[in-house]
């Protein structure tokens, strides 16, 4: 009985943890990225669609883009956690 309780409690904790992660779209909105970028047209910065097209098929793109956002090279330094940056970059690269 105790084993079953532990398994159920662990599964519940894992499921609850997933709900706390912000989606990439939420991060982009919360961090002000939409002030300079839009999904499908150039604003101050390139559109997410153009960024996704540029890096399509580039397996190193997610890490490189997260690095650029963290360091602020050619782009203002992002005030976000690594998890938030990965979610945002993942979302941008998925835009079609």
Question: What spans do the regions from the language model cover?
Answer:
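Positively charged n-region of N-terminal signal peptides that target proteins for export
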Residues: 1-4
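Hydrophobic helical h-region of N-terminal Sec-dependent signal peptides
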Residues: 6-14
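Sec/Tat signal peptide C-region and signal peptidase I cleavage site
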Residues: 14-21
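Processing junctions and N-termini across compartments
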Residues: 15, 27-30, 74
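Sequence/structural segment immediately N-terminal to covalent heme-attachment motifs in c-type
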Residues: 22-37
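Axial heme c-ligation environment in periplasmic c-type cytochrome domains
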Residues: 35, 44-56, 62-96
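Short functional micro-motifs and their immediate structural scaffolds
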Residues: 41
């Amino acid at each position: 009985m105790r084993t079953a309780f532990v398994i159920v409690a662990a599964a519940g904790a894992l499921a609850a943890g997933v709900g706390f992660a912000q989606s990439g779209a939420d991060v982009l909105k919360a961090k002000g990225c939409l002030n300079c970028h839009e999904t499908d047209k150039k604003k101050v910065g390139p559109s997410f669609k153009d960024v996704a097209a540029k890096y399509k098929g580039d397996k190193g793109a997610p890490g490189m883009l997260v690095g650029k956002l963290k360091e602020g090279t050619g782009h203002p330094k992002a005030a976000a956690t690594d998890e938030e940056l990965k979610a945002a970059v993942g979302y941008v690269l998925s835009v079609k």
